[in-house]
Amino acid sequence: MATAEEKQTSPEPVAADEPAQLPAAVRASVERKRQRALMLRQARLAARPYPAAAATGGVASVKAAPKMIDTKGGFILEEEEEKHEIGNIVHEPGPVMEFDYTICEECGKEFMDSYLMNHFDLPTCDSCRDADDKHKLITKTEAKQEYLLKDCDLEKREPALRFLVKKNPRHSQWGDMKLYLKLQVVKRALEVWGSQEALEDAKEVRQENREKMKQKKFDKKVKELRRAIRSSVWKRETTTHQHKYGPEENLEDDMYRKTCTLCGHELTYEKM
C-alpha cells in the first residue's frame, strides 16, 4: 500500500481525452479557412442589405430561415436567424459640382468641350477652329518634307506631338496615316531650327543639293547613252560592206558598167 508522500510525488497520468497540440502550419491553415468563411458570409449579407419591404411601406420585421452553407474551405456555416428592420431610405443630395471651363486662346471665351482640345490638347473652341489653314491636319510625310523634321522631333522630343490615326484613302492595304496639327508642327519646327529664316535657308540648301543630285543622274544617263551609241557605230564599221549592183550598162567597145545600189560605187569592166 502506497504512502501519502508517494501519492504526492508520483506524476499524474495524462488524460486520454485531452486533444494533442496541432502544428503551427495546420493552425494557420485552419485560421485562414475560418477567415475566408467569415468573409464569404459578410459578402453574402452585404449583397442583400435591404430585403423586400412590405407593400404598405414603413418598418417591417423579416426572419430568414436557417440554411446550411458549404464554404469550400473546410467549414460548414449555418445561417442564424436574423431580423432585418426595413425602413425608408433617405438619400442625401450630392454636392453641387462646378464645371471646369477652358478659356479659348483665340476669342477668350469659356468653353467645356472642343475637337482640338480633345484630340490635340489645344485650348481652342470649335467656333475659332480654322480647319483650312491654321488648324489644318497634315500627314507625317508632309511635316517631314515641308518643315524638315525627323521622327525624333515629332515623337521623342518633349512634349511629343499628338496625332490622329486614319486609314489611307488611296489604298486600304497600305499603312495607317498619322495626321498632325499644322500649328503644332510649325511651332516644333521653330524650336528645332530656331527661326523662320534658318528654316528657309535650310530648305534652300536642301533644294540645291536635290537639284545637283538630279543633274548628276541626268549627266550619267547621257554619258551611258553616248557610250551605247558609240559602241553600236563601232560595231557597224567593223563589218565588211558587200556591194549590191544593179543592172549593167553597155558603154562602148564591149565596155560595161554596174552601180552599187547601197553606196553608189561604179564598176567598169570589159567583156571578151
Curated annotation (Swiss-Prot):
<dbReference type="InterPro" id="IPR022656">
    <property type="entry name" value="XPA_C"/>
</dbReference>
<dbReference type="GO" id="GO:0035264">
    <property type="term" value="P:multicellular organism growth"/>
</dbReference>
<keyword id="KW-0238">DNA-binding</keyword>
<keyword id="KW-0227">DNA damage</keyword>
<dbReference type="GO" id="GO:0009411">
    <property type="term" value="P:response to UV"/>
</dbReference>
<feature type="binding site">
    <location>
        <position position="125"/>
    </location>
    <ligand>
        <name>Zn(2+)</name>
    </ligand>
</feature>
<keyword id="KW-0539">Nucleus</keyword>
<dbReference type="InterPro" id="IPR022652">
    <property type="entry name" value="Znf_XPA_CS"/>
</dbReference>
<feature type="binding site">
    <location>
        <position position="107"/>
    </location>
    <ligand>
        <name>Zn(2+)</name>
    </ligand>
</feature>
<keyword id="KW-0007">Acetylation</keyword>
<dbReference type="InterPro" id="IPR009061">
    <property type="entry name" value="DNA-bd_dom_put_sf"/>
</dbReference>
<feature type="binding site">
    <location>
        <position position="128"/>
    </location>
    <ligand>
        <name>Zn(2+)</name>
    </ligand>
</feature>
<dbReference type="GO" id="GO:0042803">
    <property type="term" value="F:protein homodimerization activity"/>
</dbReference>
<dbReference type="GO" id="GO:0016604">
    <property type="term" value="C:nuclear body"/>
</dbReference>
<keyword id="KW-0234">DNA repair</keyword>
<feature type="short sequence motif" description="Nuclear localization signal">
    <location>
        <begin position="28"/>
        <end position="49"/>
    </location>
</feature>
<feature type="cross-link" description="Glycyl lysine isopeptide (Lys-Gly) (interchain with G-Cter in SUMO2)">
    <location>
        <position position="63"/>
    </location>
</feature>
<dbReference type="Pfam" id="PF05181">
    <property type="entry name" value="XPA_C"/>
</dbReference>
<dbReference type="Pfam" id="PF01286">
    <property type="entry name" value="XPA_N"/>
</dbReference>
<dbReference type="InterPro" id="IPR022658">
    <property type="entry name" value="XPA_CS"/>
</dbReference>
<keyword id="KW-0863">Zinc-finger</keyword>
<dbReference type="GO" id="GO:0019904">
    <property type="term" value="F:protein domain specific binding"/>
</dbReference>
<keyword id="KW-0479">Metal-binding</keyword>
<dbReference type="GO" id="GO:0005829">
    <property type="term" value="C:cytosol"/>
</dbReference>
<feature type="region of interest" description="Interaction with CEP164 and required for UV resistance">
    <location>
        <begin position="4"/>
        <end position="96"/>
    </location>
</feature>
<feature type="zinc finger region">
    <location>
        <begin position="104"/>
        <end position="128"/>
    </location>
</feature>
<dbReference type="GO" id="GO:0008630">
    <property type="term" value="P:intrinsic apoptotic signaling pathway in response to DNA damage"/>
</dbReference>
<dbReference type="GO" id="GO:0008270">
    <property type="term" value="F:zinc ion binding"/>
</dbReference>
<keyword id="KW-1017">Isopeptide bond</keyword>
<dbReference type="GO" id="GO:0060261">
    <property type="term" value="P:positive regulation of transcription initiation by RNA polymerase II"/>
</dbReference>
<dbReference type="GO" id="GO:0009636">
    <property type="term" value="P:response to toxic substance"/>
</dbReference>
<feature type="modified residue" description="N-acetylalanine">
    <location>
        <position position="2"/>
    </location>
</feature>
<feature type="region of interest" description="Disordered">
    <location>
        <begin position="1"/>
        <end position="22"/>
    </location>
</feature>
<dbReference type="GO" id="GO:0006281">
    <property type="term" value="P:DNA repair"/>
</dbReference>
<dbReference type="GO" id="GO:0003684">
    <property type="term" value="F:damaged DNA binding"/>
</dbReference>
<feature type="binding site">
    <location>
        <position position="104"/>
    </location>
    <ligand>
        <name>Zn(2+)</name>
    </ligand>
</feature>
<dbReference type="GO" id="GO:0010506">
    <property type="term" value="P:regulation of autophagy"/>
</dbReference>
<keyword id="KW-0597">Phosphoprotein</keyword>
<dbReference type="GO" id="GO:0006979">
    <property type="term" value="P:response to oxidative stress"/>
</dbReference>
<feature type="cross-link" description="Glycyl lysine isopeptide (Lys-Gly) (interchain with G-Cter in SUMO2)">
    <location>
        <position position="144"/>
    </location>
</feature>
<comment type="similarity">
    <text>Belongs to the XPA family.</text>
</comment>
<dbReference type="GO" id="GO:0034504">
    <property type="term" value="P:protein localization to nucleus"/>
</dbReference>
